[in-house]
Amino acid sequence: PHVLQGIEEYKGKNIVYSLGNFCFGGNKNPSDKDTMIFQQTFTVENGELVEDDVTNIIPCSLSSESGYNNYQPMVLEGSEKERVLQKIEEFSAALNQ
């Protein structure tokens, strides 16, 4: 889908169902511009995975303009960042019941 969805934990691993449209040229003004960067860090020592639970979610908008898509994604800050994090949390809660 072209919208954010939740993150499910399955057998101790993350399933990220949709990041939304990070950079999307198919619509001049999508109604939902929310997107995210999902970072997953893996630590390998001596060829063995020792840690894989370090994650970071960076809320973004697919446009740096609110009225149209200028095809310049931007990292969100402040209340907009918190709004998107809350949205992801709500979607994720429904998946992890």
Report the location of each language-model feature:
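Conserved beta-sheet core of the metallophosphoesterase superfamily
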Residues: 1-38, 44
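A short C-terminal boundary segment appended to hydrolase-like catalytic domains
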Residues: 31-97
